[in-house]
From Swiss-Prot:
GO cellular component: cell division site; cytoplasm
Name used for this protein in its record: Cell division protein FtsZ
HAMAP family xrefs: FtsZ
Ranges that cross the membrane: none
Homology family: Belongs to the FtsZ family.
Subcellular location: Cytoplasm
Organism the protein comes from: Synechocystis sp. (strain ATCC 27184 / PCC 6803 / Kazusa)
Lineage of origin: Bacteria, Bacillati, Cyanobacteriota, Cyanophyceae, Synechococcales
Assembly, per entry: Homodimer. Polymerizes to form a dynamic ring structure in a strictly GTP-dependent manner. Interacts directly with several other division proteins.
Amino acid sequence: MTLNNDLPLNNIGFTGSGLNDGTEGLDDLFSSSIVDNEPLEALVETPTFASPSPNLKRDQIVPSNIAKIKVIGVGGGGCNAVNRMIASGVTGIDFWAINTDSQALTNTNAPDCIQIGQKLTRGLGAGGNPAIGQKAAEESRDEIARSLEGTDLVFITAGMGGGTGTGAAPIVAEVAKEMGCLTVGIVTRPFTFEGRRRAKQAEEGINALQSRVDTLIVIPNNQLLSVIPAETPLQEAFRVADDILRQGVQGISDIIIIPGLVNVDFADVRAVMADAGSALMGIGVGSGKSRAKEAATAAISSPLLESSIQGAKGVVFNVTGGTDLTLHEVNVAAEIIYEVVDADANIIFGAVIDDRLQGEMRITVIATGFNGEKEKPQAKTSSKPVLSGPPAGVETVPSTTTPEDPLGEIPMAPELDIPDFLQKRRFPRR
């Protein structure tokens, strides 16, 4: 974690290992009147962080490299998700599209593309056969490796069940891991109406991908049927799934990319997500006076959750709000999340100011190292999910654990203390 004294307070981040020297005053902020009455941005006028050492001149500071993040859409579904992210204005990320279908690649908005398996498929696609998709990726393995050079974090997105996405995504992940990238898979499981064959292929693809990524988030498309209106057109339903993919990527990348008074290091995120296995993703939106409670509750309890995040050992959560976002609201949201995760969880936290969210708050929670129990956390309140896209919706998406983990036990991230200023009501100091 690094201090940035020259940048505006549009992103605040804390890690479970505690804060930098000079932050002891944050505990007192929660009991002071400024918390309830002042927006979070105003607190920048109250210095609570240590200045750089006077013995080190500014021109002697070695600039750090910004973490390089890429999103790679594999197959038709993955490329559609990439198009959605680009259209939504996600910044600070390089987008790539990978497909066997040359015609589909001509319609992508991604600035960089790889047509895999040109000799094998002649640009005509995989015909819904994952074996063809896998062989195509193997044929173009060197090209995939070149596209990942110098990359720190890779998101691999695909629609499971088809040919290219199902077969090629695990190979892309394998190459990324070999090159030392933190590799996160965010994929969809098909709707039931897409047929048993596609569902079976999807499960096989998910199992193959699970063993090749650090963290895997699976979006069960079929559960969208329980929260979207019955009259929702088919195209809109798929768009909703694509937008959930986008929010998952952005919830993690914003913490790393957007500069602020205190920046969360890429190493902090890696500590939670490296070799974490399956993950649950929750996204909640709240508005009005109780927006913090509403957003946090929606993020951890939704009709889309297949299992509970109870006892999660690793958590990345991002709070986004307008310039009226207060420190008190951040604390309220954090306490709700801390109620359901492990007391010694390694927690990475970030707060982002977005002028478009005046009067609203959006929370993204990524939980890893959980027990995967089917019982959902009992929320004190709930909000009706609206899946029309941010910032007016609530979307919560889990991934599932495979029946038999090919890698055996999932190694947990190192356990770190929860920040004192957020956990003093919940957990005593050690």
